[in-house]
Amino acid sequence: MKDTVMTYLLENSIKFKGKPNPKAAMGKILGENPDLRSKVKEVNQVISEVLKEIETMSLEEQQAKLDELAPEGLGQKTERKRKEIELKNVKGNVVMRFAPNPSGPLHIGHARASVLNDFFSKKYNGKLVLRLEDTDAKRVLPEAYEMIQEDLKWLGVKVDEVIVQSERLETYYEYGRKLIEMGHAYVCDCDADEFRTLREQGLPCKCRDTTPEENIALWEKMLAGELDNVAVRLKTDIAHKNPSIRDFPIFRIERTPHPKNGTKYHVYPLMNLSVTVDDHLLGMTHVLRGKDHIVNTEKQEYIYNYFGWEIPEYVHYGILKIEGPVLSTSKMHAGILSGEYSGWDDARLGTLRALRKRGIRPEALYKLMVEIGIKQADVRFAWENLYAANKDIIDKDARRFFFVESPKKLVISGAENRKIDLRMHPDRSELGNRELLFDGEIYVSDDLEAGKMYRLMELFNIVVEKVENDIIYAKYDSDDFKVAKTNKASIIHWIPVKDSIPVTVIDENAEKIEGFAEKDFAVVKEDDFVQFERFGFVRIDEKLDNKYTCYLTHK
């Protein structure tokens, strides 16, 4: 909540030259965030705390903080920023690529790169290549080849061509050989620690001055499997200010069997060689990548220049800071193997499969990634913005039901049996009605106190008499809502014990919440979305016998 309040107050403060109007901000916060309307007191408290922080900031600091919290902006600012997302130097056909490593399925971080490349290739009627960068056998998960393509299809990313790097090794060998023949690369058998020491001092190793002829002979031995512990290095500036750019490696020996090639090959290109060759041969016009790849861009430009190739337009965007779910593929895989996680779609993970399982619609994620865009500033991934976009999509079709978690039996005396008809959706009468039958015994979620009055939602007022053996006993008081209001009675939802349906809801922490839903919940099908009133939106995952398993999507 604090980030949401901070965002609105900062926007308001900047609008009024550093003098925020908390009342105006409060109105906008509640107007655009219906879930906070029941928490006015708490929101007011947070506003007071946030105002103290804002008062210590200059206007420039306020703008910087707002850009961090809401990079896509609010209101009209959002529309303006959306119009600004475009590529520079677009000439003719645009060719772009999304290039993941097949070490597992895609996660939220991948979504940004895949969506932006798809967005621009569609915007400019271009072509999008999916390039699976699988030249490191140790990092390849065989099933990931298909999983990645399935994830992209779900996300709405249209792939025009699929390239698998492990199927192109002979092509990389061809260009590696050319670099050696031109004197731009050499085979190095120096000990790694020895080379590192020389590199840090800006000194060449003993292998750097060997002739192209000698290096070609060594290259042939590498390909024949006669050498180990050697690498091919690209000649750069040995005195470059960045030591990592000094004669970086472009080929290595790898004896680990490859999932696709087995042991047929044992010389594999490193990323900067294979990426450069592919980007050139596939005709990439624009390359989108994180600013953490700026050094790699400089490395790759050496190869472009040695071959006299045209360098594509590089766009380096800021880091997407994602808090919450696990994103490390190796940690996820290890957790799955150990049984800690149920699979790649475990609710605690940051995979697209996990988001899909929880009920996040691909259109919502796509929209948010386009709004985040390609700015160079680092960006915080705002879960609340994803949930808001998702709610806009699913709300209109989500039927409403009562759900009682951790149910407690409540027996009410003095009330006649009743039938309550409620709409399935407050704004869509065509979705029909649902029926609640009161017969004296109901389930509630709340711990009720003896002597207090409560209002049963859409029903009547009761007064609790006692709690005995985990059963709550109460008596009917009145129908009049004004009586409940006068007595400051809490309003609680309920369901009849009779015909109640057992439901398990799995939340974002993979915790199971057990409870009951009303009888008309039985009309839902797997993959439907519903809103459990005063609980949240859920996706129906499975029906087994008469029990349902759902995933909590968001509030």
Curated annotation (Swiss-Prot):
The name this protein goes by in its record: Glutamate--tRNA ligase
GO MF term list: ATP binding; glutamate-tRNA ligase activity
Motif ('HIGH' region): 100-110
Enzyme Commission no: 6.1.1.17
Transmembrane intervals: none
Main function: Catalyzes the attachment of glutamate to tRNA(Glu) in a two-step reaction: glutamate is first activated by ATP to form Glu-AMP and then transferred to the acceptor end of tRNA(Glu).
Species, as recorded: Methanococcus maripaludis (strain DSM 14266 / JCM 13030 / NBRC 101832 / S2 / LL)
GO biological process per UniProt: amide biosynthetic process; glutamyl-tRNA aminoacylation
Known catalytic reactions: tRNA(Glu) + L-glutamate + ATP = L-glutamyl-tRNA(Glu) + AMP + diphosphate
One Pfam match: tRNA-synt_1c_C
Family designation: Belongs to the class-I aminoacyl-tRNA synthetase family. Glutamate--tRNA ligase type 2 subfamily.
CC per GO annotation: cytosol; protein-containing complex
Location of this chain's protein in the cell: Cytoplasm
InterPro entries: aa-tRNA-synth_I_CS, Gln/Glu-tRNA_Ligase, Glu-tRNA-synth_arc/euk, Glu/Gln-tRNA-synth, Glu/Gln-tRNA-synth_Ib_cat-dom, Glu/Gln-tRNA-synth_Ib_codon-bd, Rbsml_bL25/Gln-tRNA_synth_N, Ribosomal_bL25/Gln-tRNA_synth
Top-level enzyme category: ligase
Keywords of the record: Aminoacyl-tRNA synthetase, ATP-binding, Cytoplasm, Ligase, Nucleotide-binding, Protein biosynthesis
